[in-house]
Structures are given as structure tokens and as C-alpha cells.
Curated annotation (Swiss-Prot):
GO terms for biological process: rRNA methylation. It catalyses: uridine(747) in 23S rRNA + S-adenosyl-L-methionine = 5-methyluridine(747) in 23S rRNA + S-adenosyl-L-homocysteine + H(+). PROSITE patterns: SAM_MT_RNA_M5U, TRMA_1, TRMA_2. S-adenosyl-L-methionine binds at Q251, Y277, E298, D339. It comes from Pyrococcus furiosus (strain ATCC 43587 / DSM 3638 / JCM 8422 / Vc1). This is 23S rRNA (uracil(747)-C(5))-methyltransferase. [4Fe-4S] cluster binds at C61, C67, C70, C137. Its EC number is 2.1.1.189. One of its GO terms (molecular function) is 4 iron, 4 sulfur cluster binding.
Length: 409
């Protein structure tokens, strides 16, 4: 079959006659020779690009087209922003301005490299058990080859075995960089006790951890053991030092984070704010510095401990509670910030709908879940007053949305 890509799917794949084509964009002329089913839809598994779309740019990464990390790296950045805005509108029905990332290369502050028998890197697109053996990663760091080379040397000389999807010793190499501090944290995620010799292979790291993984799930989780150098590294945003360590979440784009913080601040009314799913205090610390009276609530006890340490380090008076969002009394506040995980609020949205304050700011990287929460629950009491999109994820279809909700009079 031969034809021209006419649109993009909600997941950012090119579409022609109902067939999804990865790494292709509207205006591309393609020839499809084989398809397969993926998530109940037809996807081209073998195809060739005949005539490129004018939307295209030369991708910077040699792994583009295989690695699943950057589906849109072959598209001009200004076009990426237009499509993100359009896809958000299609999914939610909301028109929103979009702010691009100040940097679109080497912006990611963390990467989880799979340590596999096939190499060290990221998953191949649509092939979850095939790892692309990375030689570079321009969206993460120009030091990526250094990190991967050090890991390979350690494996070779220690005799430890990489993960083969069923067994092995070492599963992930997690590297975190403080983009504004220059600090580096290395976290080895393994299915065995730590090897102290690992420190010899990462002399450039400001902090080294070894996390023991006791399950076979394909995620970079484990029980962290601090091996050497500093216990924390930090990132500095608006003069605030955010402490970072394994087992916590921090927004992955340090350069676009100031835009996100300002967007949330701009949508808040009043001064007494409840920050649910507050993590390490990303919003709470900034807003406290700006004069708001903030209470942060987070289920992850490690994240709460780190948030408290960061507050102390920055001389900020903010209260953090280690509990489920559902357990907190949300009444008596001027504004409520909701920044739930990708799965959204679920039934807790019903509690917000009944007891939430006049002003709610919902932060979401998953517009499909936001609109479910809104339509099923929040829309009974709230209307969308404003929204803004922040591109935290250049070269992917993903976008961070900040939505201001107002209670009906």
C-alpha cells in the first residue's frame, strides 16, 4: 500500500487509511508492506519513506527510528508544538496556549538505561523486550557514552550478568543530572547485594547508590543503599535547592520547570494552598518562597523526608504530611493543587467535586485521564476557567497541562 500520511493519532503516530505508522508525520509519502495489531489497532511494522513531509527535520540522534524514546525527533520543533496543542484539544475539548521548552536538547535530568544481554539503553519502539544499545542520547546528556561505557566495563570486569527478562544480576543503570548544579547521581538497580567496586567505575559521580530489586517487574525500582560520596545531589530552580535521591519523582525537564512553576502560581487565588501529591515539594517550596501558606501531602514517605530537608536547607516554613491524598481534609483552603500520577484521581475526584475549594489547579501529563476525572466527577461542580500547556517533553507527543478550575456560582 502506498499513500500520504493524513493525520496523527492521539498517541502521536502517523495515520493513513486507519493504519498507524510510527516515526511518520502528515505529508509523508510512505509505502507499507506489512502491518500488525497493536493495542487493538493496525500498525505498520514494515514500511519505507518515499517522499518526506515539509514538516520534517534531520534528527540529531543516530538511534531515531528504532529507539522508542523520541517518536517526533524527525519533526520540526515548531510543528511539534502545534500538534501537541491540537492533540490536547482533540482529547479534552480545551483550547490552550502552549509554551515551548527553553532547551530541546540535553534537557532531561534523568535516564533509566536498561542493562540487558543485548546492550545498555532504551526499549525499541513497539518491541518491549528489545533494547537499543545506545551510543548517544541527545535529549539526556552528552555524557551518555561515558555513563554506558563505565557500566559495560564494570560488568565485564565484575562478571555480573545483565538482565535477560527472566534472570540476571544488574537490571538498570539510572543516572540523574543536576542541570543547573552540574552534579551527577548514579544508581545501579540490581537483583543482588551491592558490589563496592562499583565506585571505581564512576569516579565522576557526586553520589552513588545500589538499589536491590526483589521483583522481576520491568521498572527501575528497588531498595536504595547509599555507597559513596554525597547522600543527595541537588537541582537549583529560582534560587531554591531541591535535594534529589533515588526513590523520588522530580520533573524531568529542569529547563522547562520554571515555566511550569510560574503557570501554577498564576492560576492560584488566595494565599492558603493545599498541594496534594506534593512529591519532594516541587510546587510547595516555590510557592512558599513566593509568600503562599502551603501544606503538602504525599504518600511516598521518602519524598516527604526529602521535601522537609529541602525546606530546612532553603529556610522555608512549609508543612509536609506523609499520607494518602484521600486521607487529608481538603476543606478550609483558598486553593487546591492536584498533581496526581498518570492514572489520575479516580474516585477521589468525587471528593474534590463535593468538598474542594473555589479554586483548583490540576496538573497533568495525561490528558486522557484528566478529562475522565473532569467529565465523571469534577464537571458537576467546576468549570474550566483557563489552561496552559508546557512542553516538558520535546520530541515526544507528550505535554504537561495546567488547568484552572473554578466552582460554579
Amino acid at each position: 500500500m502506498r499513500g500520504i500520511i493524513e493525520d496523527l493519532s492521539q498517541d502521536g503516530l502517523g495515520v493513513i487509511n486507519g493504519i498507524e505508522v510510527p516515526f511518520c508525520y502528515p505529508g509523508d509519502e510512505v509505502r507499507i508492506t506489512r502491518t500488525r495489531d497493536r493495542f487493538g489497532r493496525k500498525m505498520a511494522s514494515e514500511f519505507s519513506l518515499i517522499t518526506p513531509s515539509p514538516l520534517r527535520q534531520r534528527p540529531r540522534c543516530r538511534h531515531y527510528g528504532k529507539c522508542g524514546g523520541c517518536l517526533w525527533q524527525g519533526m520540526k520543533y515548531e510543528e511539534q508544538l502545534k500538534f501537541k496543542k491540537e492533540l490536547f484539544r482533540r482529547i479534552t475539548g480545551i483550547e490552550a496556549e502552549i509554551l515551548g521548552s527553553p532547551r530541546i536538547w540535553e534537557f532531561r535530568n534523568i535516564s533509566n538505561f536498561i542493562v540487558s544481554v543485548n546492550g545498555i539503553g532504551l526499549k525499541e519502539f513497539a518491541r518491549p523486550k528489545t533494547v537499543v544499545d545506545l551510543k548517544e542520547c541527545p535529549v539526556f546528556s552528552n555524557r551518555t557514552p561515558l555513563y554506558i561505557r563505565a557500566m559495560k566495563e564494570f560488568l565485564r570486569e565484575s562478571g555480573l550478568k545483565p538482565w535477560n527478562w527472566k534472570e540476571g544480576d544488574v537490571h538498570y543503570l539510572q543516572v540523574r543530572e543536576g542541570k543547573f548544579t552540574g552534579e551527577v547521581m548514579v544508581n545501579i538497580i540490581a537483583h543482588r547485594p551491592p558490589e563496592e567496586t562499583i565506585l571505581e567505575y564512576f569516579p565522576f559521580a557526586d553520589s552513588v547508590y545500589w538499589s536491590i530489586k526483589r521483583d522481576k517487574r520491568d521498572d527501575p525500582s528497588g531498595e536504595p543503599i547509599h555507597l559513596g560520596e554525597k547522600e543527595f545531589i541537588s537541582e537549583k530552580i529560582f534560587g531554591i535547592k531541591y535535594l534529589l535521591r533515588p526513590g523520588i519523582f522530580f520533573q524531568t525537564n529542569s529547563y522547562a520547570l520554571p515555566l511550569l512553576l510560574k503557570a501554577v502560581e498564576g492560576f492560584l487565588d488566595g494565599s492558603k494552598v493545599l498541594d496534594l501529591y506534593s512529591g519532594i515539594g516541587t510546587f510547595s517550596l516555590y510557592l512558599t518562597k513566593k509568600g503562599f501558606n502551603v501544606v503538602g501531602v504525599e504518600i511516598n514517605k521518602t519524598a516527604v523526608e526529602v521535601a522537609k530537608l529541602s525546606a530546612e536547607l532553603n529556610s522555608l516554613n512549609v508543612e509536609f504530611k506523609a499520607k494518602r491524598a484521600e486521607e487529608e481534609n481538603i476543606e478550609g483552603y483558598d486553593a487546591l493543587i492536584l498533581d496526581p500520577p498518570r492514572k489520575g484521581l479516580g474516585e477521589f475526584a468525587g471528593v474534590v467535586e463535593k468538598k474542594g475549594p473555589e479554586n483548583v489547579v490540576y496538573v497533568s501529563c495525561n490528558p486522557k485521564r484528566f478529562i475522565l476525572d473532569f467529565k465523571n466527577y469534577l464537571s458537576r461542580s467546576y468549570k474550566v476557567e483557563d489552561a496552559i500547556l508546557i512542553d516538558m517533553f520535546p520530541h515526544t507527543p507528550h505535554v504537561e497541562a495546567v488547568i484552572k478550575l473554578r466552582k460554579y456560582s
